[in-house]
């Protein structure tokens, strides 16, 4: 059963799509309707939305911006875009952000339902037990390992060994390996199969090989969907290396943060390995640098970030730039020093939210940027330090202030909604009732 969010600033279209989906017979648990991007983001943060159906041209926040913000919250969310404009530029932007379809208004009901079914198909796969996963792999896969020569050359390219001869981009190209760059980042994916498997029943060598091969293929498939040029290869018994690259044009395109792109890839990889293979993983992400020769440094960064999982066993995706090297490279660094650093970051974020919680369009990216860490790491530290996630804290402040204004002032509902950061009084009332169990008007009585 799936949860679908419809976003359109024309209420009649939203209602019509809601009715169409509700009577379709598709396995839908809940349908939500939002009238602008801000309302939609509240639903995405509060509910486990599987599919987003959004208009591309709306008021304060476009469908393109909504897609980007939605991916930051839930990188795996499926999206269908609807538009009154048959414009290639809009369609291209939507597809780059992972839209599964781009439909032109007036909508054809049959076409929309077909698109919804197709988008939900990928979500139908459930997490399998280890035994089911291995049985499926035995039946379905004829393992064709990647070329040993290609794997050796790629690992050599990342190696710190000064005596090794690094292959050139031209030499790699002859072998079918495209690494033109010129901008690169390195990700490491460490598979922890034994953490998901009872210690008294370890996998056979053959089964471990099957899982590793499946992980390589899932990684390649996921990266192909992101339209990022990449190379994936083995770099150890339980480890994959991923080289992400940007050409000059895509790197200079600032419409989407490169760090956000890498973070979304990392989180999607972690989730996919758990969902489809039942494997626990750790993902590390380097910074971005120019030139093929930078891969040695970037690989070193990714390796270092991977080691930081020992300090944070309850975290999964590590970005090198999040960690103060002066703290993490000292063997004598105490837990108190690390705890103090984490508190400073979390408290800085909390202070920023205290000042800006009523701002319409406040984003996790904005709060993270203000505190000089990635959104993923800030989310982790904030919840660990404060016992609630960042958006729960934003909502707490908004609801407490709106309750105070209702009880202590004569302000109207639309004025209070505006004051605490909501686009419409109707949406504010829904959130308020969900939070307190009564509507603003009932509290006012």
Question: How does the language model describe each region?
Answer:
Residues 1-152, 180, 226-235, 268-272, ...:
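Alpha-helical/coil-rich non-catalytic "connector" segments in signaling and regulatory proteins
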Residues 111, 259, 263-266, 270, ...:
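Catalytic-core segments of nucleotide cyclases and related cyclic-nucleotide turnover enzymes
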Residues 135, 279-292, 308-340:
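Flexible, glycine/charge-rich interdomain/linker segments that couple
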Residues 13, 211, 215, 265, ...:
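Hydrophobic alpha-helical membrane-association signature
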Residues 231-243, 272-303, 316-321:
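A short glycine-enriched loop-to-beta-strand structural element that forms part of the catalytic core
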Residues 18, 216-220, 266-274, 303:
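Generic solvent-exposed, charged/amphipathic alpha-helical segments
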Residues 108-264, 319-336:
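Interdomain helical linkers/hinges and coiled-coil/dimerization scaffolds
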Residues 201-202, 284-287, 364-365:
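Glycine- and acidic
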């Amino acid at each position: 059963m799936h949860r679908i969010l419809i976003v359109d600033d024309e209420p009649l279209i939203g209602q019509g799509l809601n009715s169409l989906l509700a009577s379709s017979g598709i396995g839908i648990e809940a349908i939500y309707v939002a009238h602008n991007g801000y309302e939609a983001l509240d639903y995405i943060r509060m509910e486990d939305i599987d599919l987003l159906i959004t208009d591309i041209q709306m008021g304060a926040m476009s469908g393109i911006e909504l897609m980007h913000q939605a991916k930051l919250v839930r990188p795996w969310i499926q999206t269908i875009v609807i538009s009154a404009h048959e414009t290639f530029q809009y369609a291209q932007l939507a597809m780059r952000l992972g839209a599964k379809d781009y439909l032109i208004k007036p909508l054809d009901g049959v076409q929309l339902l077909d698109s919804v079914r197709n988008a939900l198909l990928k979500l139908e796969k459930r997490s399998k037990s280890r035994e089911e996963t291995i049985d499926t792999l035995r039946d379905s896969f004829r393992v064709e390992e990647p070329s040993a020569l290609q794997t050796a050359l790629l690992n050599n390219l990342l190696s710190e060994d000064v005596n090794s001869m690094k292959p050139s981009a031209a030499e790699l190209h002859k072998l079918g390996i495209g690494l033109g760059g010129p901008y690169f980042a390195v990700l490491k994916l460490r598979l922890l199969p034994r953490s998901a498997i009872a210690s008294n029943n370890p996998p056979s060598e053959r089964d471990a090989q099957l899982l590793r091969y499946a992980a390589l293929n899932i990684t390649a498939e996921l990266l192909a969907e992101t339209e990022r040029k990449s190379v994936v290869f083995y770099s150890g018994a339980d480890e994959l290396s991923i080289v992400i690259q940007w050409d000059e044009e895509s790197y200079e395109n600032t419409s989407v943060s490169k760090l956000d792109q890498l973070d979304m890839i990392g989180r999607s990889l972690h989730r996919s390995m758990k969902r489809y293979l039942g494997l626990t993983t750790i993902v590390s992400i380097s910074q971005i640098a120019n030139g093929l020769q930078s891969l040695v440094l970037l690989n070193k960064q990714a390796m270092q970030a991977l080691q930081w999982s020992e300090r944070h066993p309850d975290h999964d995706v590590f970005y090198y730039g999040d960690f103060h090297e002066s703290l993490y490279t000292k063997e004598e660094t105490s837990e108190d020093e690390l705890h103090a650093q984490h508190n400073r970051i979390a408290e800085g974020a909390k202070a920023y939210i205290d000042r800006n919680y009523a701002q319409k369009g406040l984003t996790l990216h904005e709060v993270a940027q203000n505190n000089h860490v990635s959104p993923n790491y800030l989310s982790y530290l904030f919840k660990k330090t404060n016992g609630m996630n960042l958006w729960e804290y934003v909502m707490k402040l908004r609801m407490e202030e709106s309750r105070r204004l209702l009880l202590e002032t004569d302000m109207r509902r639309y004025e209070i909604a505006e004051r605490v950061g909501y686009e419409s009084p109707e949406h504010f009332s829904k959130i308020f009732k969900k939070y307190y169990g009564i509507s603003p008007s009932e509290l006012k009585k």
